[in-house]
């Protein structure tokens, strides 16, 4: 892992002040996939608008020289949430009986990958959360499987799969104990 130059992490609980930076860095992070409907910037904008209106919205952005270079955001999900309803097989009650953090997305500008920036953003985001578990969904094919392997190295484990929308690939659902 290469050590990155200093980054500043900023936490947001209101999308209005971070939306432009989120869209800008998303377009850089997902550039090779933007031609696919699920990854288009407009689709991300619609998702982030919807997610920011849900309970517990928090985003952490990393900045270098004033420019966004990475991001992650999350929400709180409750027992019975559509997130859990779309997960197959049904997750164990120990994960769903209490509110959980759903890490909706994390991304780092290509020039900042393999520098520890993603982990710093991830850890800063989870430090704002009180829920006992954090869950995320990942495309097992992302980065030729490297992204899934990275999450496993961070302590996440597979608990099922989900296809959140018809345009989405089938995703692995992973969980990690946060507290």
Protein language model regions, located:
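Conserved acetyl-CoA-binding loop-helix of GNAT-fold acetyltransferases
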Residues: 103-110, 114-127, 149, 153
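Glycine-rich acetyl-CoA-binding "A-motif" of GNAT/NAT acetyltransferases
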Residues: 67-70, 146
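A short helix-loop-beta-strand connector motif used in the catalytic cores of GNAT acetyltransferases and
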Residues: 49-61, 76-82, 102
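Conserved GNAT acetyl-CoA-binding A-motif
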Residues: 128-141
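Conserved acyl-donor/pantetheine-binding loop and adjacent beta-alpha core of acyl/acetyltransferases
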Residues: 73-105, 164-166
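Conserved catalytic-core motifs of GNAT/GCN5-like acyltransferases
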Residues: 137-140, 152-171
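Short amphipathic alpha-helix that is part of the acyltransferase structural core
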Residues: 1-46, 59-68
């Amino acid at each position: 892992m290469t050590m990155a130059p200093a980054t500043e992490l900023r936490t947001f609980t209101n999308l209005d002040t971070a939306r432009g930076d989120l869209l800008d860095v998303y377009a850089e992070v997902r550039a090779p996939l933007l031609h696919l409907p699920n990854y288009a910037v407009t689709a991300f904008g619609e998702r982030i608008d919807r997610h920011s209106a849900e309970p517990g919205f928090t985003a952490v952005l990393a900045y270098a020289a004033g420019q966004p270079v990475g991001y992650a955001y999350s929400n709180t999900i409750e027992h019975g949430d559509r997130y859990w309803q779309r997960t197959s097989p049904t997750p164990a009650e120990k994960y769903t009986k209490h509110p959980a953090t759903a890490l909706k997305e994390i991304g780092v500008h290509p020039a900042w990958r393999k520098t520890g920036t993603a982990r710093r953003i991830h850890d800063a985001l989870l430090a704002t959360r009180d829920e006992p578990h954090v869950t995320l969904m990942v495309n097992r094919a992302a980065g030729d499987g490297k992204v899934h392997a990275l999450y496993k190295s961070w302590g996440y484990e597979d608990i099922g799969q989900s296809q959140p929308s018809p345009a989405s690939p089938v995703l692995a659902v992973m969980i990690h104990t946060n507290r």
